[in-house]
Structures are given as C-alpha cells and as structure tokens.
C-alpha cells in the first residue's frame, strides 16, 4: 500500500509541477547554419522589441503594453517553442518548466530575468480520492510536457498503470482536455488558467491542493511548503548585449502593467477568440491568479529552490546539465 501511495502522490504534483502548459514542438529543426542565417535576414527591419508570449497571463499584460503610445513592442503569441529555441526573439514569457530545456538547447544563450506568476497548478477529479486504491480504473488527463518531463512521468508510473488499470492520456492542448471532460467519468485532470476556471464553472469537481499532496508522499525529500513557479521572463543574450537599458525599461513597464490590469479594461479580440472567453471573464481570471514580480537575487533563490524540487523527484532529471548561476539576469 505504501508503494502505491508513494507513486500516486508523486505523480500528482509532478505531472503539472510548473503550471501553465506549452507543448513541445515535435518537428525536427534544421541544423543547417546557412538556412538559419537566411531566416534571420528575412525578418522585417524594425526598431521595435520582438517579444514572444507563451502564457495566458503574459498575453493579457503584453496586450496592454503593445498599445502604448511609443509602440516600442512587437508582441507575438506563440503556440510552440521553435522560435525560442532558434533564438528568433528578443524577450519572451514562457512556462517555468521549459527554462532548463531552453537554456541547454540554446547553448546557454538565454537568461532568466523575472518570475511573474506562481502556483498556476490545478488538479481536479469527478470523484473524491482518499487513498491509492481509489485510483484504480481512473483516466489521468495531462497536457503534454517536454521530453524529460514525459520520461519522468513514465518512470514514476511504472508497473502501477497496468496493475491498477490506470489510463494516462496526453493532450496537445488544454482545450482538448476541456472538451473531453464533458463526456468523461473517473478522471483526474491537470489544468492551468484559464482552463481551470472554465472546467469548474457549473461543474462540481473535487479539487486537490498540490502542497497537501506532496506532504503525503512517504519519506519524500521534496518540501511540501512554498510556491510553485509558473511563468517567467527570459531574454536573448544577443539582444541583451547592446540593449541592457532598453530591457530594464521593459521589466519596469511589465511590472507596472501587471499591477494596472483592472475590470473594465478592453482586451484585443485575439485573446478573447483564442481562449473562447468573454472580456469580463478574461480579466476576472487574470485577477484571481497569483501574479507576482520577483527579480534579481530573490528570483535566483526562488528558482534554485524550484530546481531542487525537480531534482528531489528525480536526481537525473537534468542529465547533469543543471544551469549554473550564469542563467540569472540580475540588475
């Protein structure tokens, strides 16, 4: 029983440890340097800062910044990380769990500059689960993570999937999870905002607190207290090299805009269409989130604790490539 319990309560926080989902691009990327140079040359010539948005909260904040009078920011919503991996950006807001993978794939050519959202992790089920035996026959609905996370999930589930007839379904988009929830039973689903709020509207799902789940892991080395890092700002070193003042200005403006979002603000139609929610719902959900702005030494300390949590779940998760202090941008 203890073995089942340990596996169950490890996979709950693990499957969605970092919060908001962004799927990993599955297409093979070219290694032809000449082709990469040509692609860069085709980018339009502009003095505007190229910002990529990969999370819900950043979509709303950057929408506000993009409407500023000086038109300094060129904001693009992205659905995969291919442009980040090829360094085709100046600044980006991405899910925290992608940072180490991106750092290694870009040969260390990014820096982490700020933590902007915490605790965007939500676990729901249509049934109460009081002990591991009640996991039997359940379907776990999970947004697809990156390769290292997916391998970690499989290794933790192991033989229990077959023995307890647990079915794990990975989804390219949380939109698909929402659709399937409507006609599914005996499920556990992992969601981030705004999909979590959409799922629980008019539905009586049981909700699980991630920290409480972690505290139930027998002999766990992972601390059950503290916040989970969800959204972060990263910067391209090539841009940062000659634009430190400009980047510092962006960080200050992002922080200010984050605190200025209020009821009555009118969002761009693209956001409303993409998330299939009303303007009022979008603002309300944003305001309910744990929006924060942590930078410099405090950010580095918080993120190191986050990386420690991952390593305590699996000591080989970074395959010996855990970033050094060079990862952090400190003003």
Regions inferred by a protein language model and the residue ranges of each:
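C-terminal motif of bacterial Sec signal peptides marking the signal peptidase cleavage site
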Residues: 18-19
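Bilobed "Venus flytrap"/periplasmic-binding protein-like clamshell domains
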Residues: 40-68, 126, 132-198, 269
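Pocket-flanking alpha-helical
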Residues: 60-63, 77-109, 121-130, 176-180, ...
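Short beta-strand-to-loop elements that line the ligand-binding cleft
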Residues: 70-80, 90-93, 163-174
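Pocket-lining segment of extracytoplasmic ligand-binding domains
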Residues: 97, 173-269
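A structural signal for short loop-to-beta-strand junctions that line the ligand-binding cleft
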Residues: 108-115, 139-141, 217-226
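Secondary-structure end/capping motifs
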Residues: 240-313
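Conserved C-terminal helix/tail region of periplasmic/extracytoplasmic solute-binding proteins
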Residues: 308-331
């Amino acid at each position: 029983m203890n073995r089942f319990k340990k596996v169950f309560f490890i996979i709950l926080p693990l499957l969605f440890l970092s919060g908001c989902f962004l799927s990993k691009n599955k297409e093979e990327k070219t290694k032809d340097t000449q082709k990469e140079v040509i692609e860069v040359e085709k980018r339009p010539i502009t003095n505007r800062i190229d910002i990529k948005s990969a999370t819900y909260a950043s979509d709303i904040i950057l929408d506000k910044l993009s409407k500023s009078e000086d038109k300094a920011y060129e904001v693009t919503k992205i659905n995969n990380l291919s442009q980040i991996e090829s360094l085709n950006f100046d600044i980006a807001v991405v899910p925290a769990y992608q940072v180490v993978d991106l750092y290694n794939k870009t040969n260390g050519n990014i820096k982490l500059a700020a933590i902007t959202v915490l605790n965007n992790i939500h676990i729901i089920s249509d049934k109460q689960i009081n002990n591991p035996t009640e996991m039997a026959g359940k379907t776990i609905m999970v947004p697809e993570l990156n390769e290292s996370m997916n391998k970690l999930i499989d290794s933790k589930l192991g033989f229990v999937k077959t023995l307890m007839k647990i079915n794990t379904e990975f989804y390219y988009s949380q939109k698909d999870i929402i659709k399937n929830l409507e006609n599914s039973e005996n499920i556990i689903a992992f969601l981030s905002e705004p999909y979590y709020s959409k799922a629980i509207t008019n539905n009586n799902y049981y909700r699980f607190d991630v920290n409480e789940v972690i505290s139930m892991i027998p002999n766990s080395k992972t601390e059950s207290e503290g916040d989970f890092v969800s959204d972060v700002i990263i910067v391209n070193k090539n841009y940062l090299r000659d634009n430190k003042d400009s980047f510092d200005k962006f960080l200050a403006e992002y922080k200010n805009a984050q605190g200025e979002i209020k009821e009555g603000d009118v969002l761009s139609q693209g956001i409303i269409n993409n998330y299939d929610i009303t303007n009022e719902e979008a603002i309300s959900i944003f305001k309910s989130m744990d929006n924060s702005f942590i930078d410099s030494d405090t950010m580095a300390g918080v993120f190191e604790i986050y990386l420690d949590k991952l390593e305590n779940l699996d000591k080989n998760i970074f395959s010996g490539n855990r970033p050094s202090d060079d990862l952090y941008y400190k003003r």
